[in-house]
Swiss-Prot record:
Record region (NMP): 30-59
Domain remark from Swiss-Prot or TrEMBL: Consists of three domains, a large central CORE domain and two small peripheral domains, NMPbind and LID, which undergo movements during catalysis. The LID domain closes over the site of phosphoryl transfer upon ATP binding. Assembling and dissambling the active center during each catalytic cycle provides an effective means to prevent ATP hydrolysis.
Single GO term (MF): adenylate kinase activity
Domain of life: Bacteria
HAMAP family: Adenylate_kinase_Adk
Entry EC no(s): 2.7.4.3
Function statement: Catalyzes the reversible transfer of the terminal phosphate group between ATP and AMP. Plays an important role in cellular energy homeostasis and in adenine nucleotide metabolism.
UniProt similarity note: Belongs to the adenylate kinase family.
Protein name (Swiss-Prot/TrEMBL): Adenylate kinase
Organism of derivation: Mesorhizobium japonicum (strain LMG 29417 / CECT 9101 / MAFF 303099)
Reactions the enzyme catalyzes: AMP + ATP = 2 ADP
GO CC annotations on file: cytoplasm
Subcellular location: Cytoplasm
Amino acid sequence: MRLILLGPPGAGKGTQAQRLVEKHGIPQLSTGDMLRAAVQAGSEVGKRAKAVMDAGELVSDAIVNAIVAERIDQADCAKGFILDGYPRTLVQADAVESMLSERGIGLDTVIELVVDDRALVGRIVKRAEDAKAAGQPVRKDDNPAVFEERLREYYKKTAPLTGYYYAKGKLKTVDGLASIDAVTNEIEAVLTAAAEAR
């Protein structure tokens, strides 16, 4: 099973990805984790990424795409994987299609967690309040002003992916405002339908 989780920040992608990892035994591939692992491993592409990050610059699509390609070739991805936080742009989406096609595989489905913006801001404020109450540090991006900027960036760059995957017949939407268990159940229903359609 190879899938992409889409949705704005705070939609619950990380929570749902973790549940999918536990149930299906496939890895969650997040770009941040992959970049750190490539740098730590000292691979050729990891060295290029480190040089860019050390210079305080953003890692290019070419480097991110190479790191993703390197990662999906690892043995634990043979049964599938969950892409979380990648692709973020149409250029990256095209790169995913190419790298999978080169390997003779494809995406099973793309799941978008749909959540109302006002509810997202409320969710982030509550997450910050809960962290404070528990004596835990509050995430930098759990500040409403910072979060709203992240939302704007998401709609500008990443939201066009929904149309891209809809046109390919891969996009399925799930109500991200439902309870965590209800969202999980809906995702599992989507995955079952995708498996039966293969």
